Design a protein with these regions (language model features):
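N-terminal accessory beta-strand-rich subdomains and adjacent acidic, glycine-rich linkers
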Residues: 1-152
Length: 152
């Protein structure tokens, strides 16, 4: 993506080029959620109307007072094992104590010029820093201290 915008008030990221938009945000529980991927749309500060929040019977809720917020039905950017989302996780870590439960929450981001090389992984490349912009999103599990770094 050539353009990356972060809206601090809504904690929303909008990545876009001439044809497509990719929008994600920090959810109310600190996880990253995917809001939109498709035809380019105009940037705005608040895309929360695109997050589907409705009550569903027989599902797991994060908050007792909010039966419209369920990780089982929200598109997460990087879902993990054991957080009431029963779909396949993006990562499952076996910890020393035998637990596989992680909860990676947003801690920050960084936008830099260029495209870093990923050792041992297939990736596109950029000839110069002006050809690309990279977004790094940092997620941290508070119990283990492990930090995930997502690159876009």
């Amino acid at each position: 993506m050539r353009n990356i915008v972060f809206h601090d008030k809504t904690k929303t990221f909008h990545l876009y080029n001439e044809k497509i938009s990719y929008i994600m945000c920090v959810l109310e529980n600190g996880h990253m959620g995917q809001i939109y991927f498709g035809k380019k749309i105009h940037d705005k500060e608040d895309f929360s109307y695109l997050v589907e929040k409705i009550e569903r019977p027989m599902t797991s809720y994060i908050y007792e007072w909010d039966k419209s917020f369920s990780l089982e039905h929200i598109r997460q950017e990087y879902p993990v094992y054991g957080t009431t989302d029963y779909r396949h996780p993006a990562i499952e870590l076996l910890q020393k104590n035998g637990s596989r439960i992680s909860e990676f929450k947003y801690t920050g981001y960084e936008i830099t010029k260029g495209k870093p090389k990923l050792q041992g992984l297939p990736a596109i490349y950029a000839e110069s820093e002006e050809e690309a912009v990279t977004l790094r999103i940092y997620l941290r599990d508070s119990l283990t201290g492990i930090i995930l770094e997502l690159l876009y």
